[in-house]
Amino acid sequence: MSRGEVNQLTGPSMFIGLNGDDLISFGSGQPDLPPPENVFKVLPNFTSFKYGPIQGQRHLMEALALEHHVPPENVVITNGASEAIDLCFSTLLKPGDMVLLTKPYYYAYPRLVEINKGVPTYTRLVKGKIDLDDFRKAVEGCKAVLVNSPGNPTGSVQSPKTLSEVEKMCNDLKVYLIFDEVYCNLIYEGEHYSPRGEYVVNVNSFSKTFAMCGLRVGYLYSENEEFIKAIVDQKTYKSMNTSILSQEMAFEALKAPKSFITHHLEVWRKRRDLIYNGLLDLGFDLWKPEGAFYVFPRVDNPRKMVWDLYKRYKVITYLGEWFGVEDRIRLSYALDARKIEEGLERIREYLSGS
């Protein structure tokens, strides 16, 4: 692998949107399953092309408030979860403020901190889990903490006990806890826990649960009313309202039967088992994902492997260094079982040198 080839592995953006009949992409974390059928009934009669309320469509805010047990006024609809996190940072941070991230992290987190003049600092996960002793030391002096569970890229679910400890620490220290729970409905083992409190902001999305990534509908909620007002003020000048059409489709998605989520979860579980067992059989060192749809195996020479798999075998994987860890790669199993099996076979061929 030449220096020029090494330099071509610039980041996930080089792979996002690539497709082809012979390409197997374990890259993007975008569900390939369909959204709820009822969301499409919005389209034929949609006529609302004017600006909408900055904070969101009232009926969508009310539906989400009912689900999360907060007042509607404490919900803000955003352009995906990414905007929700960006708004949190732009509202909270002054130049030089430190934000604690768990490592490995979702690749966008450090850059979002830096764009908003903050300084990312880290606490290392142990096999995907928060080490409370290390966390306790690392959180001192921070303005905010960002925790993601179920995790991307780890697939790990933090325990209620751990998250309640994190919640208490942050509220006691008056450090804002931004809790990214976009995969909360994709849990195979363990239990989801949503932290709460004056210094907690919960972030969620319709992208993963309802397979609506391209519509860009996320939201945040918090018990802190003053913080919510400051968020809305920031959004007023940054992006105004989230797409009205997308919000109407999101509102319909909330009416989908519970079987929609449980059916999708079983599909994800089967795919998880397929790729996890397949990688184990190939000799990889990895833990079993408890949620989301990623595996994060340890590999030797990950840059060479990612490049060769792409150029020689037409298999896309993501470098672990994009997520803060240099000796691993990330594979998403957001693709059908046949493609997972074909991708595993190509990885086997790569490992055998054929």
Give the residues covered by each predicted segment:
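N-terminal small-domain helix-loop-helix segment of the aminotransferase-like
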Residues: 2-87, 255-256, 353-354
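PLP-dependent aminotransferase-like
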Residues: 91-148, 168
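Helix C-cap/helix->beta junction micro-motif
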Residues: 116, 172-173, 282, 313
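PLP-dependent enzyme catalytic core of the Aspartate aminotransferase-like
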Residues: 308-317, 323-354
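Conserved core segment of the aminotransferase class I/II
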Residues: 199-269, 349-351
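Conserved glycine-rich beta-strand-loop-beta hairpin in the small C-terminal domain of fold type I
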Residues: 251, 266-276, 286-298, 324-327
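Active-site phosphate-binding strand-loop segment of PLP-dependent enzymes
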Residues: 126-191
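Short acidic capping loops at alpha-helix termini that bridge into adjacent secondary structure
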Residues: 71-75, 95-98, 198-199
